[in-house]
């Protein structure tokens, strides 16, 4: 029954009344689908008929074709403008085009002005000859005037011919010679006037051409300047947006890295509590320092004692003090040794300068690193070679653990733990860079020998 309804696209009202609301909606949906299907079939059939008609039409023969010109090497002949010695520069070509356009514009203006003057003169002469005649009378007398003028012209031509014939037949007199000389002088004066007028006209034309050329040239320069300034502004805007985006991404990455590293440090048991627990067992008691007599230095010593974190050197501390500090406090902790304490790590270096560390890293390339005893503080410096150059990071060794200088940094029990950790986890300040290749000692040189003696 449904097929019959869809084929006829009709349902009896009594039968429709017996259907539920849901069945009615389904039936209406099916009928709409059938309408769309029939319409699509009709569209496809019309398209096929149109294609058949289009293909059946005879095509016009096209005789046009393109032939490439070939050079002596049997390749397509190519001419790059500006490379040949006889080619004009681009700026000169542009100037010539502008000058030609300005000349044409000036000639056009001069022609329009000349036509305007001719029209004004003709109107003025008409008014002088016929001051009381109206337009209708002038129109009626036009044919008559043309006939009269034609008759006068024919009569004058006949008179001139007769005079010429008489001049040829009769011998020339003194009066004729004087008349001819006078006519010649008049003709020469007329020619001079015409030449002067032409020169003035040419001068005006050249001045107008130069004026138009300068105006167009100035407009073109202003346009080029505005385009250049707009490009520079767009470029600066793009760079500033990139810089802002880079700063935001770096800040976000630093926050994410810190959260991730903190969680990993907690999971690995390398947080400060674990470091303190094991440090209390391994670290021997520090011998008491001798009491100094009260002096002006007490104030500076008290300030250093009160200050937490990394200890900086004052003017009284030198290389010997650093060596003494290392032997008394760091050597018992096996700082710079492997976890078992059997050998010194290849990345460990003694008291070397920043320049010496950069020279060592430069010979090993990107990804190399070393850890050296600082020559300025009682601590260490991690030097790393990246694509942008060498970076140096201070390591705080004032507490019972080791960490990079700053707040909320992960703390490690030993230097070896710190290095091993950052072989798999990047330093936040470096982005995604890892400690990959340890940079060892120079051949035949051991820069930490004075620390182990």
UniProtKB/Swiss-Prot annotation:
<dbReference type="Pfam" id="PF00017">
    <property type="entry name" value="SH2"/>
</dbReference>
<comment type="function">
    <text>Inhibits estrogen-induced cell proliferation.</text>
</comment>
<dbReference type="InterPro" id="IPR000980">
    <property type="entry name" value="SH2"/>
</dbReference>
<dbReference type="GO" id="GO:0019902">
    <property type="term" value="F:phosphatase binding"/>
</dbReference>
<keyword id="KW-0175">Coiled coil</keyword>
<feature type="region of interest" description="Disordered">
    <location>
        <begin position="280"/>
        <end position="301"/>
    </location>
</feature>
<dbReference type="GO" id="GO:0005737">
    <property type="term" value="C:cytoplasm"/>
</dbReference>
<feature type="domain" description="SH2">
    <location>
        <begin position="347"/>
        <end position="439"/>
    </location>
</feature>
<feature type="compositionally biased region" description="Pro residues">
    <location>
        <begin position="284"/>
        <end position="293"/>
    </location>
</feature>
<dbReference type="InterPro" id="IPR036860">
    <property type="entry name" value="SH2_dom_sf"/>
</dbReference>
<feature type="coiled-coil region">
    <location>
        <begin position="96"/>
        <end position="127"/>
    </location>
</feature>
<keyword id="KW-0963">Cytoplasm</keyword>
<keyword id="KW-0727">SH2 domain</keyword>
<protein>
    <recommendedName>
        <fullName>SH2 domain-containing protein 4A</fullName>
    </recommendedName>
</protein>
